[in-house]
Each structure stands twice: as structure tokens, then as C-alpha cells.
Amino acid sequence: MLITLGWASLAALFSFSIAMVVWGRNGDGSMNF
């Protein structure tokens, strides 16, 4: 259970960081980090 939860949070954090990079490179101006 704990290992599954750890992998789930790791996958969510990884996909979130990828989304941040994609949105940052889009340059639409709605989100600037």
C-alpha cells in the first residue's frame, strides 16, 4: 500500500513537472513560472 502510494505521488509529481515545462514553453502568457 505504501509503495503503491509512493509510486502514485512520484508519477503525479513527474507529470506535473512535465506539464510545467510544456506550459512554460508555450508562451501563451497565462502562466509564467
From Swiss-Prot:
For this protein, the record's NCBIfam families field holds:
PRK02529.1
> Under which name does UniProt file this protein?
Cytochrome b6-f complex subunit 8
- InterPro entries in UniProt: Cytochr_b6-f_cplx_su8_sf, Cytochrome_b6-f_cplx_su8
Species of origin reads Paulinella chromatophora
Name the Gene Ontology molecular function terms of this record: electron transporter, transferring electrons within cytochrome b6/f complex of photosystem II activity
Name the SUPFAM superfamilies for this protein: PetN subunit of the cytochrome b6f complex
Location in the cell reads:
Plastid, Organellar chromatophore thylakoid membrane
Q: Where are the transmembrane segments?
A: 2-22
Role according to the record:
Component of the cytochrome b6-f complex, which mediates electron transfer between photosystem II (PSII) and photosystem I (PSI), cyclic electron flow around PSI, and state transitions.
Q: Which GO terms describe its biological process?
A: cytochrome complex assembly; photosynthesis
* Cystine residue pairs: none
| Keyword terms of this UniProt record | Electron transport, Membrane, Organellar chromatophore, Photosynthesis, Plastid, Thylakoid, Transmembrane, Transmembrane helix, Transport
